[in-house]
A protein has these predicted regions:
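A general structural motif at alpha-helix termini
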Residues: 26, 37, 67-71
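Short, charged recognition helix plus adjacent turn
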Residues: 61-80
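Conserved N-terminal glycine/acidic-rich loop preference
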Residues: 29-31, 47, 70-76
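Short, basic-rich loop-to-helix N-cap that marks the start of a DNA-contacting helix
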Residues: 40-53
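Recognition helix of helix-turn-helix/homeodomain-like DNA-binding domains
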Residues: 27-43
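A short, Lys/Arg-rich alpha-helix, primarily the initiator
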Residues: 1-15, 21, 25, 52
Length: 80
């Protein structure tokens, strides 16, 4: 658990995006973002796409990094 959360946490920190800003952009409760970032819960596949879309509206580079980090981590898990 946590591959999306790790990627999201890194991107939010790198691009100085608050959890609240992402939540407002996505139209979800900040508690959802908090759970993902703290790896208490993984977002479902649709939410991963919604995260990417919201990040794109905030900063396109952040969206690209999120997907790259998420997929790189996923690829590593598949190779284990």
């Amino acid at each position: 658990m946590g591959k999306a959360g790790k990627a999201l946490k890194q991107v939010l920190e790198t691009y100085n995006i608050s959890q609240n800003r992402l939540a407002v952009t996505m139209g979800v409760a900040r508690s959802n973002i908090h759970r993902w970032v703290n790896e208490n819960r993984d977002p479902v596949a649709e939410a991963v796409l919604d995260i990417r879309k919201a990040l794109w509206h905030i900063n396109p580079d952040a969206a690209g990094d999120f997907i790259r980090l998420y997929l790189d981590d996923l690829e590593e898990k598949l190779q284990e």
